[in-house]
Curated annotation (Swiss-Prot):
A zinc finger (C4-type) spans 31-53. GO terms for biological process: fatty acid biosynthetic process; malonyl-CoA biosynthetic process. GO terms for cellular component: acetate CoA-transferase complex. Pathway: Lipid metabolism; malonyl-CoA biosynthesis; malonyl-CoA from acetyl-CoA: step 1/1. It catalyses: N(6)-carboxybiotinyl-L-lysyl-[protein] + acetyl-CoA = N(6)-biotinyl-L-lysyl-[protein] + malonyl-CoA. It is found in: Cytoplasm. PROSITE patterns: COA_CT_NTER (PS50980). Keywords: ATP-binding, Cytoplasm, Fatty acid biosynthesis, Fatty acid metabolism, Lipid biosynthesis, Lipid metabolism, Metal-binding, Nucleotide-binding, Transferase, Zinc, Zinc-finger. This is Acetyl-coenzyme A carboxylase carboxyl transferase subunit beta.
Length: 306
C-alpha cells in the first residue's frame, strides 16, 4: 500500500465519516415547499410552519392536540378501543399486518385521537386524525372514537373541535368503514339540535369519505393555508372529465374564494382565534390569550452533507 494512500486518503475518509456522524439524526429538516434547510428546534418554535415560505407541514394528531389545548386537565377518550380485522381482508398484504405496521410506526392504536380538556380555560373536546396511520383512513374505531368525543360534548354541553387529515374511508373495512360516514354525521346532527358548536379544521390533506361526512359538517369550517381538500384527487378528476382543472383547485384558498369553507387560519393563530370564536358561539367572556415567551435559539451552521 502506497504512503499516499495511508497518509492522505484514509485519514481524509475517516475525517469525513466523523463529520457525518457528528450531526444528530433529525436535527435538520428540508422544507418540502421552498427547500430551505431548517434547524429542527427552531422549526418546533413555529409549530412546524416554515419561517421562510409559511408552508404548513404535516404534523401528528398528538402534536396538534398538544399545541391546541391547555396543558392541564386533559383526558383521552376511547383509548381502550383497538381495530379488529373482522373481514379477514387481504389485498397485497393482510389487513392485520398493515395494522401492526401502522401501530409500530406511529405508536397509535388507530388513526384518530380524541381528548377532553380546556382551550384558554374553556371546556372543549378535541379529535385529531393521525395521517401517518394508514393515511388517516376512517374505520370502525375512528368512527367510534369520534362519536364518543361528540357524546362527551353532548353530556357536558361543551364545544367540539376536529382536526381532519385523511384520505377517506378505510377500504380494508369495506361497508363497515362506509357506515362511519352515516354514524359520525348522525351524532353531529344531534350536536346541532342541542345548539352545541362543532368547529371543523381542515388540514392537509382531507379527501374521500371524511370530506364527504364529518369534515364538511362544521358550524364553522376552517382551513389551514394551502391545505388540499376534496373528494377525489385532482388527477382522478382530470382523467374522468378530460379537462384541465383551474390553478390551485382543491387548495383551501380556492375553496374559501368559492364559499366552501369559512376561514383560513394560520396554525400559529388557531388557539387565540378559535378561542375567541368559541367564546362568541357559547356566550362566554372573551378569553385572554398570553403567548408563551419565545426563547432565543442559536442556529448552528448548516452542515455541508445535509
Amino acid at each position: 500500500m502506497s504512503n499516499w494512500l495511508v497518509d492522505k486518503l484514509i485519514p481524509s475518509i475517516m475525517r469525513s465519516e466523523v463529520k457525518k456522524s457528528s450531526v444528530p439524526e433529525g436535527l435538520w429538516h428540508k422544507c418540502p415547499s421552498c427547500e430551505a434547510v431548517l434547524y429542527r428546534p427552531e422549526l418546533e418554535k413555529t409549530l412546524d410552519v416554515c419561517p421562510k415560505c409559511n408552508h404548513h407541514m404535516r404534523i401528528g394528531a398528538r402534536a396538534r392536540i398538544d399545541i391546541f389545548l391547555d396543558a392541564e386537565g386533559r383526558t383521552e377518550l376511547g383509548a381502550d378501543l383497538e381495530p379488529v380485522d373482522r373481514l379477514k381482508f387481504r389485498d397485497g398484504k393482510k389487513y392485520k399486518d398493515r395494522l401492526v405496521a401502522a401501530q409500530k410506526q406511529t405508536g397509535e392504536k388507530d388513526a384518530l385521537v380524541s381528548m377532553s380538556g380546556t382551550l384558554l380555560g374553556m371546556p372543549v373536546v378535541v379529535s385529531a386524525f393521525e395521517f401517518s396511520f394508514m393515511g388517516g383512513s376512517m374505520g370502525a374505531i375512528v368512527g367510534e372514537r369520534f362519536v364518543r368525543a361528540a357524546n362527551y360534548a353532548l353530556e357536558n354541553r361543551c364545544p367540539m373541535v376536529c382536526f381532519s387529515a385523511s384520505g377517506g374511508a378505510r377500504m380494508q373495512e369495506a361497508l363497515i368503514s362506509l357506515m362511519q360516514m352515516a354514524k359520525t354525521s348522525a351524532v353531529l346532527a344531534r350536536l346541532r339540535e342541542e345548539g352545541i358548536p362543532f368547529i371543523s379544521v381542515l388540514t392537509d390533506p382531507v379527501y374521500g369519505g371524511v370530506s364527504a361526512s364529518l369534515a364538511m359538517l362544521g358550524d364553522v369550517i376552517v382551513g389551514e393555508p394551502k391545505a388540499l381538500i376534496g373528494f377525489a384527487g385532482p388527477r382522478v378528476i382530470e382523467q374522468t372529465v378530460r379537462e384541465k382543472l383551474p390553478e390551485g383547485f382543491q387548495r383551501s384558498e380556492f375553496l374559501l374564494e368559492h364559499g366552501a369553507i369559512d376561514l383560513i387560519i394560520d396554525r400559529r393563530e388557531l388557539r387565540p382565534r378559535l378561542g375567541n370564536l368559541l367564546a362568541q358561539l357559547t356566550g362566554k367572556p372573551t378569553p385572554k390569550f398570553v403567548a408563551a415567551p419565545i426563547e432565543p435559539i442559536v442556529v448552528p451552521p448548516v452542515p455541508a452533507n445535509v
